Amino acid sequence: LDEVRDKDIANISFPDLVEITGYLMLYRISGFTSLNQLFPNLAVIRGRTLFKDYALIIYEMLELENIGLNNLVMIERGNVRIEKNEKMCYVDTINWARITMNNSPYLEVGRCLQFQI
């Protein structure tokens, strides 16, 4: 996604991607408010290779409002790190212990802008 222009980002989607064998890192990608647009059918992250013990990293996605990985049911190995996503809401409503096979996620949840006055 490094070479994609902001105006084209809305057209990018990987609907056939159901499983990732390694890790998924999302870092400073603009143009997305939800990952459902990008990975609508992602169900499993295996974590056979990890990034510093993490299988899912969502970091500094400044426009992301919700994770939206509605079909994600299992992270087989590795932890979750979600940090510095200023607009993200509802991260703490996901049962991460069930999805991560009892691993402990690292969640730094900022204030949800939707609820600020």
Regions found by a protein language model. Give the residues of each.
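Extracellular/luminal ectodomains of secreted and membrane glycoproteins with large N-terminal domains
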Residues: L1-I117
